């Protein structure tokens, strides 16, 4: 044990937090989570241990701008200014200091290993009573599961130790410091340390004791570490559980270790041995270790599909059977290996349906509770995810247990990121930083290696490629050869990774960056000498209204076996709740706390909002990742199972046929398909519709029974096909009254019964409609070529930087947002049974014509207004965001009814999950409340739209809400939006894709850009 004076002044003088060679003082060695049961049955059933005591709860807290401002007296007693805070928590969430959101740029001046003199410091203290029996024998430890970023610990005024690495436990022996009765802990937490240079992740920078604190009492002679591994014969019919156990304390001949393996209430195998390890070299073996091997016949294998778990109980006892202590862990029998260019689990090639997940809560910052963790896992499973990357640090220890039990594959990632360094490997190639990096990697492996869910180790994120990475790669491969190692830095295919693991590589497009080219994922596989599997560590940047082009990745994954999936960036929006002057909550992002530097809304890239409400894009991910694939041939549906291990046993296939949303026939049957097999389902003779319309066959896979992660009735997969239809024959219309045209100097007015239409002859726009005396429009019907910019359109996060290549900057520079209409033509003609208005406009900016729009409005005796639009786009202007019409309707109806794709928001490059049907939703549900307002709520493939007294028919896309595109574009946060008068309707003949390969470069695929030059669309507007 290192002993230094208890004086605060001496600790401050040492400045351990500015020394990369000091990562800890007196911290105990890493190991799996312990509970020190004194009853093996309690260990087997995972009951709460009486030897493990939580110190979570109310602690005293005082904040200071720098450690030097902390008074020496604090070591002995609480300060008068101390407040009460809950541990675990981030002190910024209690109003102390400000959270800082930055992506790449360090939040402090870059001068490693030194940190600013103004270094916010939190002083925590807790008084507690200790069980006297704990003082009489054994060892009492204190465990801090997570403290950001570094801390010194005192107990009863005496200095105990120091720790850093905010995402792994720091554990200390308190035995020599405790006394009977009351004891006082004092923890001085520093916001910045040299470790902060290794923690430059894309996240909020917060501080404090943000994970659990607990006391653990161990016997003097104790289990100090244990490691389990599983091995198999070729066909997995026989397995061996290998358990290596290490002890600490007095090594006595009478000591024994028993390892028993349980499957529920049944003991499967057991073995007992004295200490004394196998011979390692010419000097012998470890006297304090023992390895036991248990044979298991026909093991129930673990996978994310079927997470079969056993329970291993490790007992330390004497030769007469007296139990000293027991530890335990869940065991999953599974094998991970790379063979022939494929990542295999239990001999089967995995397809990673993954997502990156930050530990984030809108109210609690980076504090994770079990309820939130379970909620995340259930949502992931329900949306067909099978893997999660712990981006970019080891998670709360409970997370791994939950992933073991519910079934998720985990990439466990070291808490190392130096993204803001120039070059990025400035520290990771420096041997002075090897000890700090080594602690972060080796301790992660030692803590988490017993979890079957952990199938891949990661050396960190965005830290370049340095010699330290190579050293740590070799250490992991030596200590744990049972798992592959991945690391993206330095180009995603260095010698420090077993898996090609690029981020944001595109399917077909190369990005030849200097030094670290990012090839298309298809090309990467075929590079000379390259035989590794490719799994994208990050892809499909889900920032705001995004995930366009997601289907293209999944087409490639299914086409090329060595393209084994990837991890979407990312799971949850990292917005934080703030309160306005009236106490109303609102969602905040970078800069909203006065934090500098900041990257604004770049912290919100989630498939779910911060409160875990799904984004519409989550449904697209669910559909593309579904485990059942379908093909229709005549009356036969071929169902292919992509499950590797699971035979369908809780699935019904429901099919239905509908004509324009009207059901014609339906049925259901059980799915009985083996893993990686097919089932052919013969449908009955389908009815022939008597009228014209869109005829669709829809299949859903429904789970009739609840599972551990889903309720009864859960839909896991679906598909639609448009069937052959009857030809549409238009019968002559019955005679109607003829609309009357009235012409004045300013207007053309058409009247039919109680309806009137008014066209302004100076503007050429439909300026008003009446039904009876009620006006229907608040603004004229106009062309629209722009959208409120998406994050993907903006392309940058820094408030001080503009990317001229971003879509929004190109649109602005070309004048799309400022364009004004110059009237070229506005005429009226009376036909035999209709009135025809013909208009033409040149949309211009600074004398340059960007678009020419020609329209005809044919109003017939039935009251229908048929609108035909032809648009020409100037060859030298950027491709527009949309080609459509917009107006502000006077009505505010409660519901929207449409026949088209839905029910969720969908866009041309993100619509495979949408189904054609007749949908009916509240108006409020037609708006997607992205925290950073943008274009939202589009529904594609629409044949009919009904709202209030109005109906629109044709083939178009629309969105409808209380917010104009102008307001969405000018508003920074959703809570600042105000419902405008009436309802804004946007009807598009064509709409550009939204992109999403990444959010900082134009990522809309060419096929989803409006590049044709000329466009034609038409629709009918009438009253019901």
Swiss-Prot record:
Enzyme Commission number(s) of this protein: 3.2.1.23
Binding sites annotated in the UniProt record for Mg(2+) 2: 598
Subunit-structure text: Homotetramer.
BP GO annotations: lactose catabolic process
Catalysed reaction, written as an equation: Hydrolysis of terminal non-reducing beta-D-galactose residues in beta-D-galactosides
Tagged with keyword Hydrolase: yes
Site positions (Transition state stabilizer): 358, 392
UniProt KW keywords: Glycosidase, Hydrolase, Magnesium, Metal-binding, Sodium
Cofactor annotation: Mg(2+); Na(+)
Source species, domain of life: Bacteria
Signal peptide stretch: none
Gene name of the encoded protein: lacZ
HAMAP family: Beta_gal
Keyword Ubl conjugation part of the UniProt annotation: no
Native source organism of the sequence: Shigella sonnei (strain Ss046)
Binding sites annotated in the UniProt record for Mg(2+) 1: 417, 419, 462
Similarity section: Belongs to the glycosyl hydrolase 2 family.
SMART domains assigned: Bgal_small_N
Protein name per UniProt: Beta-galactosidase
């Amino acid at each position: 044990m290192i002993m230094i004076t208890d004086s605060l002044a001496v600790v401050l003088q040492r400045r351990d937090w500015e020394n990369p060679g000091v990562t800890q003082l007196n911290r105990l060695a890493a190991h799996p989570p312990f509970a020190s049961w004194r009853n093996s049955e309690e260990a087997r059933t995972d009951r709460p241990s009486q030897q493990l005591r939580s110190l979570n709860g109310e602690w005293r807290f005082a904040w200071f701008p720098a450690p030097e401002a902390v008074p020496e007296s604090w070591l002995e007693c609480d300060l008068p200014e101390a407040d009460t805070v809950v541990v675990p928590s981030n002190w910024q969430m209690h109003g102390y200091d400000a959270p800082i959101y930055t992506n790449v740029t360090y939040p402090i001046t870059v001068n490693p290993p030194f940190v600013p003199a103004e270094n916010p410091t939190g002083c925590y203290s807790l008084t507690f009573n200790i069980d006297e029996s704990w003082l009489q024998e054994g060892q009492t430890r204190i465990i801090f599961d997570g403290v950001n970023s570094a801390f010194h610990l005192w107990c009863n005024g005496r200095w105990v130790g120091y720790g850093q690495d905010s995402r792994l436990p720091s554990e200390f022996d308190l035995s020599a410091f405790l006394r009977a009765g009351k004891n006082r802990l004092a923890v001085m937490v520093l916001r910045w340390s040299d470790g902060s240079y290794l923690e430059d992740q894309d996240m909020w920078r917060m501080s404090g004791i943000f994970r659990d604190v607990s006391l653990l009492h161990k016997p003097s002679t104790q289990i100090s570490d244990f490691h389990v591994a599983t091995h198999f014969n070729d066909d997995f019919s026989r397995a061996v559980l290998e358990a290596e156990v290490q002890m600490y304390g007095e090594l006595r001949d009478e000591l024994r270790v028993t390892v028993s393996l349980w499957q529920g209430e049944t003991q499967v195998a057991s073995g007992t041995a004295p200490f004394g390890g196998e011979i390692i070299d010419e000097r012998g073996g470890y006297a304090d270790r023992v390895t036991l091997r248990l044979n298991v016949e026909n093991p129930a294998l673990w996978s994310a599909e079927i997470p079969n778990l056993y329970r291993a109980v490790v007992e330390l006892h004497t030769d007469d059977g007296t139990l000293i202590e027991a530890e335990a862990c869940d065991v999953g029998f599974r094998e991970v290996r790379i063979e022939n260019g494929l990542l295999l689990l239990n001999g089967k090639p995995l397809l990673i349906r993954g997502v990156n997940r930050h530990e984030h809560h809108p109210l609690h910052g980076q504090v994770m509770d079990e309820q939130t963790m379970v909620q995340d896992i259930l949502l992931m499973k329900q949306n067909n995810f099978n893997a999660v990357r712990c981006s970019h640090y080891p998670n709360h220890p409970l997370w791994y247990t939950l992933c073991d039990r519910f079934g998720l594959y985990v990439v466990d990632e070291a808490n190392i990121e130096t993204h803001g360094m120039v070059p990025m490997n400035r520290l990771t190639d420096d041997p002075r930083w090897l000890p700090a990096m080594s602690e972060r990697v080796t301790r992660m492996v030692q803590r988490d290696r017993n979890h079957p869910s952990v199938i891949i180790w990661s050396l960190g994120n965005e830290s370049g490629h340095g010699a330290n990475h190579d050293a740590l790669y070799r250490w992991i491969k030596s200590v744990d050869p049972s798992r592959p190692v991945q690391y993206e830095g330095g180009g995603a295919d260095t010698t420090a990774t077993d898996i090609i693991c690029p981020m944001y590589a595109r399917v077909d497009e190369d990005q030849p960056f200097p030094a670290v080219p990012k090839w298309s994922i298809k090309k990467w596989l075929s590079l000379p000498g390259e035989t590794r599997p490719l799994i994208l560590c990050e892809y499909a940047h889900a920032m705001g209204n995004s995930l366009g082009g997601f289907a293209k990745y999944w087409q490639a994954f299914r086409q090329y076996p060595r393209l084994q999936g990837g991890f979407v960036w990312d799971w949850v929006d990292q917005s934080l709740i703030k309160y306005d002057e009236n106490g109303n909550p609102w969602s905040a992002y970078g800069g909203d706390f006065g934090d500098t530097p900041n990257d604004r809304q770049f912290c919100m890239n989630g498939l779910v909002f911060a409160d875990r409400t799904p984004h519409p894009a989550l449904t697209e991910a669910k559909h593309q990742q579904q485990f059942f694939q379908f093909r229709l041939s005549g009356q036969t549906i071929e169902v292919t199972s992509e499950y590797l291990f699971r035979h369908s046993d809780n699935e019904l296939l429901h099919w239905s046929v509908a004509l324009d949303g009207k059901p014609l026939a339906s049925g259901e049957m059980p799915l009985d398909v083996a893993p990686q097999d097919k089932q052919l389902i013969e449908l009955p003779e389908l009815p022939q519709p008597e009228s014209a319309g869109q005829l669709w066959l829809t299949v859903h896979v429904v789970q009739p029974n609840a599972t551990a992660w889903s309720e009864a009735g859960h839909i896991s997969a679906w598909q639609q096909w448009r069937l052959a239809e009857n030809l549409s024959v238009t019968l002559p219309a019955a005679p109607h009254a003829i609309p009357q045209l009235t012409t004045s100097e300013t207007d053309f007015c058409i009247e039919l019964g109680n309806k009137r239409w008014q066209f302004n002859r100076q503007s050429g726009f439909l300026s008003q409609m009446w039904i009876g005396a009620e006006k229907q429009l608040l603004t004229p019907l106009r062309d629209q070529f722009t959208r409120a910019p998406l994050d993907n359109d903006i392309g940058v996060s820094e408030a001080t930087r503009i990317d001229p290549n971003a879509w929004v900057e190109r649109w602005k520079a070309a004048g799309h947002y400022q364009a004004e209409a110059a009237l070229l033509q506005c005429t009226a003609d009376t036909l035999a049974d209709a009135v025809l208005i013909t208009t033409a406009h040149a949309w211009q900016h600074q004398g340059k014509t960007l678009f020419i729009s020609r329209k005809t409005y044919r109003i017939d005796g039935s009251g229908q207004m048929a609108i035909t639009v032809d648009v020409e786009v100037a060859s030298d202007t950027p491709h527009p965001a949309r080609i459509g019409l917009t107006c502000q309707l006077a009505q505010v109806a409660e519901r929207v009814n449409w026949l088209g794709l839905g029910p969720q928001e969908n866009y041309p490059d993100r619509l495979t999950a949408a189904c054609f049907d007749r949908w009916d939703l509240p108006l409020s549900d037609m708006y997607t409340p992205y925290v950073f307002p943008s274009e939202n709520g589009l529904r594609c493939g629409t044949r009919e739209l009904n709202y209030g007294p109005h109906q629109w028919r044709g083939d178009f896309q629309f969105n409808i809400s209380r917010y104009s595109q102008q307001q969405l574009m000018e508003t920074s946060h959703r809570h600042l939006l105000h419902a405008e008068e009436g309802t804004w309707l946007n009807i598009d003949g064509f709409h550009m894709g939204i992109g999403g390969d990444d959010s900082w470069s134009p990522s809309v695929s060419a096929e989803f850009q409006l590049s044709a030059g000329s466009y034609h669309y038409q629709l009918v507007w009438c009253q019901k």
